[in-house]
């Protein structure tokens, strides 16, 4: 039997593949999800198995047993409703499939029952002819199994079994009535077909009769017209007699056919009466079948009531046993309630302690955060102070350089003033000599220079060489100035980088000292606490601090290497760097001494605070001391900023003075050039003078103009 059911399941799976659903339906595991079956039902009757119902079927269920079970339940419920409401057939006589076995065990027997119900829906819907034709195209073995399943469904839908003995006669009567009904329906179809044929023959004969009657009328007319036709001796009479004989034969045949038609009509009426009787009998049998179904439903209800009564009796027995055990459970319940009360008190006390610990931890975290922020601010302010100190040193060096330049310019100004006075005196003497007529051009005293005795070519070459020497000297001075500025910029960059690295180095040393202090504190805590449960946390914290310490040391080593790389090659810069290193070492020693004093004062403050109130947080004293240091640093920074601003103002004033001096010198130089050009244009200089004499003549031309004018007026 199980083999037949498995063959039935496999054949029905092959039949289900003809629907060409989107979901796979090749194996039993593919069908356990229910997606392929729901899509096939939607193709069978889209009006009942609608799109909304199809959307409720989950497709991606995977191995989820619950989702598969829900899908199969929805499909089975919809099929049963389809049989009851659309096909008007009760499914009480058909064993419904066990869906749990289908989902969990992939049972082919139960799956075959479900597929058999789907097959019944297909062969009983509006498109049953199409699906029957599809079944006929399958293989013979599959077709035979599918037809057997259809016959089983058809046999089960006829009548339902009532019980044991009285149901046998009714079943036989129903089977016999169904056989008679099928025979009568077949005979009815044959008689209807025969009636159609006879009707066609009657119509043909009536047409022939009408045509013959028309011919008969024509012949009677002709017979009336031609009385000679009555004479049989004439050929027309013989023809008339023959036609009359044929007419009589046709009339007899017509009468015979009408009699046969009447006989067939009577026989058809009798068959219709028999069909009406059989329909009444079929209605009676269907009413009996409905009564049998209702009786079977009542029998099933009574059986379920009896089963329920048995279950209730068993449950009553179990409840009695449970009531017997209830007293023990109550005693245990009381004991558990007492334990629960004790546990509740313990939990309340522990929660209070935990709340206090959390509050203390939060306060400690805030203090730690404040300390870290203050450390960060201190490092930033110290870096800023170092930068300001470096800027101040730079400004001081610039100031010293400007003071030296000012002294040099003042010395040069004094020398120029002296030369100017000498030139004025000589000019005054020359003017007096010219006025007195004692100073004549071309005299031996005027040509007292050795250069004037040289030829003109040598003088021109000498002048050109002097000009080239001057230009080369100017180019060399410009290149030396550019080189000096580049070296000064490199020195400033090196100093700035060194100061930055020094500040970073100092901050890293401070951080290392703090980390070492924290490591020592943690080691002391580990030694004091011994085997407490939070040793792992302290060890992790110690390891983290050690890692930070190693990183800080590595960073210091890298910055030391950078400092070594930034050592200048020039001797002057090396000397200055040595001086700066000495000053830096001195500052480092001062900083170490200050740090030692700070640590000593900090330890003393901690001891005092602990001695006063051990419950207070030790971080508050550190915070206060750091705040004091920050305020001192702020004051120092403000003072340095003021000094820096004053130095900038002094530098700006010195720059203004220098620019005014340079502008004045440029104006004097322009005036001299203009006087030279005007002198050459007027050709006032005699051709026999030397270059220096020409220069003196050009420079003194303007001054002599003011003296010559009043002299000429007096003459």
UniProtKB/Swiss-Prot annotation:
CDD domains: HkD_Hook1 (cd22225). One of its GO terms (molecular function) is microtubule binding. It is found in: Cytoplasm; Cytoplasm, Cytoskeleton. This is Protein Hook homolog 1. Belongs to the hook family. Residues 6-122 form the Calponin-homology (CH) domain. One of its GO terms (cellular component) is microtubule. May function to promote vesicle trafficking and/or fusion. Residues 167-434, 463-656 form a coiled coil. Interacts with microtubules. Gene3D superfamilies: Calponin-like domain (1.10.418.10). GO terms for biological process: cytoplasmic microtubule organization; cytoskeleton-dependent intracellular transport; early endosome to late endosome transport; endosome organization; endosome to lysosome transport; lysosome organization; protein transport. Keywords: Coiled coil, Cytoplasm, Cytoskeleton, Microtubule, Protein transport, Transport. InterPro entries: CH_dom (IPR001715), CH_dom_sf (IPR036872), Hook_C (IPR008636), HOOK_N (IPR043936). PROSITE patterns: CH. The lineage of its organism: Eukaryota, Metazoa, Chordata, Craniata, Vertebrata.
């Amino acid at each position: 039997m199980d083999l037949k059911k498995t063959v039935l399941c496999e054949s029905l799976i092959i039949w289900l593949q003809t629907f060409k659903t989107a979901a796979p339906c090749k194996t039993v595991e593919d069908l356990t999800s229910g997606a392929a079956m729901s899509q096939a039902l939607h193709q069978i009757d889209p009006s009942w198995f609608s799109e909304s119902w199809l959307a409720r079927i989950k497709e991606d269920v995977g191995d989820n047993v619950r989702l598969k079970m829900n899908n199969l339940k929805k499909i089975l419920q919809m099929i049963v409703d389809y049989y009851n409401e659309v096909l008007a057939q009760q499914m009480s006589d058909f064993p419904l499939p066990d869906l749990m076995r289908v989902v969990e065990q992939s049972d082919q027997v139960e799956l075959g029952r479900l597929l058999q119900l789907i097959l019944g829906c297909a062969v009983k819907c509006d498109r049953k002819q199409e699906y029957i034709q599809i079944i006929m195209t399958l293989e013979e073995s599959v077709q035979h199994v599918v037809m057997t399943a259809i016959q089983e469904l058809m046999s089960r839908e006829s009548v339902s079994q009532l019980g044991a003995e009285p149901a046998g006669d009714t079943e036989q009567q129903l089977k016999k009535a169904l056989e008679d009904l099928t025979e009568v329906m077949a005979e009815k179809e044959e008689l209807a077909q025969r009636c159609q044929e006879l009707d066609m023959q009657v119509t043909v004969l009536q047409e022939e009769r009408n045509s013959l009657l028309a011919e008969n009328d024509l012949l009677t007319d002709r017979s009336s017209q031609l009385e000679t036709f009555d004479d049989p001796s004439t050929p027309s009479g013989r023809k008339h007699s023959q036609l009359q004989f044929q007419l009589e034969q046709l009339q007899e045949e017509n009468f015979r056919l009408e009699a046969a038609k009447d006989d067939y009509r009577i026989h058809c009426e009798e068959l219709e009466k028999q069909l009406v009787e059989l329909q009444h009998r079929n209605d009676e049998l269907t009413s009996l079948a409905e009564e049998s179904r209702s009786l079977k439903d009542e029998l099933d209800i009574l059986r379920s009531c009896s089963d329920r009564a048995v279950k209730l009796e068993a449950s009553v027995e179990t409840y009695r046993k449970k009531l017997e055990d209830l007293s023990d459970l109550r005693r245990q319940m009381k004991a558990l309630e007492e334990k629960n009360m004790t546990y509740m008190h313990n939990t309340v006390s522990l929660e209070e302690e935990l709340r206090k610990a959390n509050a203390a931890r939060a306060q400690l975290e805030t203090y730690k955060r404040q300390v870290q922020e203050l450390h960060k601010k201190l490092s930033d302010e110290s870096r800023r102070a170092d930068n300001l100190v470096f800027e101040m040193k730079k400004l001081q060096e610039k100031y010293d350089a400007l003071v030296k330049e000012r002294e040099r310019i003042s010395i040069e100004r004094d020398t120029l003033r002296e030369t100017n006075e000498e030139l004025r005196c000589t000019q005054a003497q020359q003017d007096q000599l010219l006025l007195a007529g004692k100073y004549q051009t071309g005299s031996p005293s005027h040509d007292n220079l050795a250069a004037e005795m040289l030829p003109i070519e040598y003088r021109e070459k000498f002048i050109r060489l002097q000009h080239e020497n001057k230009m080369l000297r100017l180019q060399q001075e410009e290149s030396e100035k550019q080189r000096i500025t580049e070296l000064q910029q490199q020195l400033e960059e090196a100093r700035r980088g060194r100061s930055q690295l020094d500040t970073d180095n100092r901050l890293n040393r401070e951080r290392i000292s703090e980390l070492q202090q924290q490591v020592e504190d943690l080691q002391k805590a580990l030694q004091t606490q011994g085997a407490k449960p939070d040793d792992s946390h302290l060890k992790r914290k110690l390891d983290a601090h050690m890692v930070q310490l190693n990183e800080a040391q590595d960073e210091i080593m890298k910055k030391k290497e950078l400092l070594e790389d930034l050592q200048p090659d020039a001797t002057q810069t090396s000397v200055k760097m040595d001086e700066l290193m000495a000053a830096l070492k001195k500052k480092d020693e001062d900083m170490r001494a200050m740090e030692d004093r700070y640590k000593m004062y900090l330890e003393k403050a901690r001891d005092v605070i602990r001695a006063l109130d051990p419950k207070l947080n030790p971080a508050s004293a550190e915070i206060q001391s750091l705040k004091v240091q920050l305020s001192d640093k702020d004051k120092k920074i403000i003072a340095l900023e003021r000094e820096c601003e004053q130095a900038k103002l002094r530098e700006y004033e010195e720059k203004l003075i220098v620019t005014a001096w340079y502008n004045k010198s440029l104006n004097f130089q322009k005036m001299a050039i203009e006087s030279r050009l005007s002198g050459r244009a007027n050709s006032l200089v005699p051709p026999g003078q030397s270059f220096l004499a020409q220069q003196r003549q050009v420079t003194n031309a303007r001054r002599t103009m003011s003296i010559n004018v009043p002299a000429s007026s007096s003459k």
